[in-house]
Amino acid sequence: MDLRFIADAEPTPSERAALDDVLGSPGSSWEGGARLTGADGNTAAGGHAARAQRHLLLPALWALQERIGWISPGGLNDICRRLTVPPADAYGVASFYALFALEPRPPRVVHVCEDVACRCHGSQDLIAQLEERFGPEGELSDDGSATWHRSPCLGQCDRAPAALVSVAGDEPLERAQAPVTAAAVLDLLAGGEPGPSPAAPLPQAGDASLRLLRRVGVADAASIDDYRAHGGYAALRRAFELGPEGVLREVKDSKLVGRGGAAFPTGVKWEAVARQPARPHYLVCNADESEPGTFKDRELMEGDPFAVIEAMTIAAYATGCERGYLYLRGEYPEALHALEHALAEARARAFLGANVMGEGLAFDIEIRRGAGAYICGEETAIFESIEGKRGEPRNKPPFPVEVGLFGKPTVVNNVETLVNVLDVVLGSGPAFAEVGTEGSTGSKLLCVSGHVALPGTYEVRFGATLREVLDLAGGVPGGRPLQAVLMGGAAGGFLGPDDLDVPLTFEGARAAGTTLGSGVVLVLDDTVDLPRLLQRIAAFFRDESCGQCVPCRVGTVRQEEALARLRAGEPRGGVATELALIAEVGQCMRDASICGLGQTASSAVESAIRRLHVFQGEPA
């Protein structure tokens, strides 16, 4: 897109209608409306008025993407006029997100996952068949209406291999397809109707010991009455009885820590925001689980969406928030539909709005959809994205509890963390803390995928061993030997066959030199080419680095280059020299990167070299 000519570009009627749905009909002639304001008949919002609209940039870009399949110059120009955003700025935002196309693209696109879990289930063979029978990625169908692209993890690892089909138009359609075959993808590219979204495997469905997953697959996820019949909104009622201070006390006593990877004490975070005098306070639910191999939050949102809403409402009540944002991963269309329906039902029944349950609490939730940027799982990058900017992390301090979304005190928790709060409030903080271990209380959702007989989301008490989890999942199929387990996703670390008795706690994982991270347990049998897998992980971090800081921007590239040379058998200065370079680059990224992406970009690679002796001539 050549920005030199964008000023003369105009949107089509269809594009304008799509933007009207998000931004409202333009008022002034500057925005494309009929009202004349100003001596020359044009006016532009400035200062506070312009800043107040900027946060609508991402929803506006999504409106164009869904209507015509790409962001056209005319559409982008219209957005810039209406929101008073410079074209170069808007272009910089649009080009940051992988799901937005800035060049003409056919209305039908199939994204085929090529990441680690799908590779265990034949995605590379599937892609090879597509290249042979259809053409390379980006190739158009004979009628120009469809194409396909490779994709990083789509969060469907429990039913791999996976694809995501997107069909633009007046009634856009987006749907996950998993497990998928080459024949099915070819049918989609030929105009076939996407099948219904497959049900997630629920290996523990109906287990009376479940807490976080107790309603998933049991209660009707679309019915607020069924949710209430299964205990829904009892926790919110109890929260009103306790009062904000009582809720804070219970959450602190529970010793609940964040389940997204950082493991920060939830009660400490909530109390810090509640005590901030600046107003308003904001609540952000981080539902952008883009760590490869992670899918637990998706299954909570699809299978128990009212629980997410209830938990957010309790968090808002305890911390004094009047507005909540649920930042949802762009590749989760089914979760989007489930949450939109649940929000509408909750508003209709006064569980959201100006007077929640008649208790005087004013609180509502808005969904903000991400657009394919791994870095937006970082809490401050989410703020930037919601505010209509590139999702680049901020320097800390100041911390979000002081200066967060829109510069105000902000609570950020992920989906699993929030849903835990329901049990904390319904029971008590001390009762919650009795489950698990002293340093890791409660239960944990684990995303078990790869070479296991029964992949899926498993709920286990902290302290269970990796061996017990693999037994729950049926072990490695076909009697093949276990080669390794990737814990915590691409930002995590490897464990070997001798590490199966590691207790799955935060402290146990640290002692073993790995991490629980987002709960990924990716099982690899002896058929996996580990050097190739490591290069894929390195390529993932290279692609997903936002490029803001030099250590990460350069280090992720140098790491991948070194791994490529080692795989090709062409090390510079010998294998030991290359391994030393990887270690040095990794240390530099840990020490000097702004955010967790750079700080963990070498974790899996270095753990495989250290623990599994990859590239060192010993069997992995």
Where are these regions (language model features)?
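Feature of Fe-S/electron-transfer and energy-metabolism proteins
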Residues: 1-620
